Amino acid sequence: MFTGSIVAIVTPMDEKGNVCRASLKKLIDYHVASGTSAIVSVGTTGESATLNHDEHADVVMMTLDLADGRIPVIAGTGANATAEAISLTQRFNDSGIVGCLTVTPYYNRPSQEGLYQHFKAIAEHTDLPQILYNVPSRTGCDLLPETVGRLAKVKNIIGIKEATGNLTRVNQIKELVSDDFVLLSGDDASALDFMQLGGHGVISVTANVAARDMAQMCKLAAEGHFAEARVINQRLMPLHNKLFVEPNPIPVKWACKELGLVATDTLRLPMTPITDSGRETVRAALKHAGLL
């Protein structure tokens, strides 16, 4: 469940900005039918930053309900205050989720020791498997391989989503962790190379709109068929890149609407609708991928 193509699913909303259950069900059904390995609910792409804690928990529980055991659900539970992250994580202790994705604290930029103590404290307050999430371009701090190696020895910490796009990190981390520590890419454009170096899969934005292709690419890579996987990846490469032509999840939410997967591409401020130029750029990438 912690391998292959794991979608960082969008949180669909109606025109008033309320979570749209019907669109979420349609998305989940799409991922079940497409072979997606698991769903990350309310991560960065799921607009965690603009949902309050009650809404956050409600979306995760709604996702679990709609998934109905057909696909594993991972909850995004990160926060920049350790006590807050613990509280959010503990909401899901007996919920049925299979694990938590916990981002490094953002804005306050803790030291490596602070990061170690933060994640250790969270892991000690739950029995849920914890996946570390390193995305310094968003958080302002970088979880270094040496710290990952220390954290890998903590009970319940089972893997990392590495979203730096720095492929040297794969071997650096592999040298410091056990073979069963899960290495997941958080960068679609380099995910195949990440897997070829020994990674286990990707937590993907692209999978929101190209679920079957991403699942097949990861399956081929896991089986060692990298030439065949690369054919798929090259077709998707413009999409990997252009889904970030404007801040995530603006482009991917619009793409989901364009493909009829959600009813609207409504976002909450400070996220604003995609621009005309952004729309045309993403549409061209969808066509290149064979999705339009």
From Swiss-Prot:
Principal place of residence: cytoplasm
Keywords: Allosteric enzyme, Amino-acid biosynthesis, Cytoplasm, Diaminopimelate biosynthesis, Lyase, Lysine biosynthesis, Schiff base
Protein name: 4-hydroxy-tetrahydrodipicolinate synthase
Binding site for pyruvate: T45, I203
Similarity annotation: Belongs to the DapA family.
Annotated phenotype, changing Y107W: Reduced activity by 95%. Reduced affinity for both substrates. Exists as a mixture of monomer, dimer and tetramer in solution. Has significantly lower thermal stability than the wild-type enzyme
Gene: dapA
Entry GO CC: cytosol
GO biological process: diaminopimelate biosynthetic process; lysine biosynthetic process via diaminopimelate
An annotated Gene Ontology molecular function: 4-hydroxy-tetrahydrodipicolinate synthase activity
Result of changing Y107F: Reduced kcat by 90%
Positions of the record's site feature: L-lysine inhibitor binding: A49, N80, E84, Y106
Enzymatic reactions: L-aspartate 4-semialdehyde + pyruvate = (2S,4S)-4-hydroxy-2,3,4,5-tetrahydrodipicolinate + H2O + H(+)
Location(s), subcellular: Cytoplasm
UniProt KW Cytoplasm keyword: yes
Subunit structure and binding partners: Homotetramer; dimer of dimers.
HAMAP family per record: DapA
Reported effect, K161R: 0.35% of wild-type activity. 3-fold decrease in affinity for pyruvate, but nearly no change in that for (S)-ASA
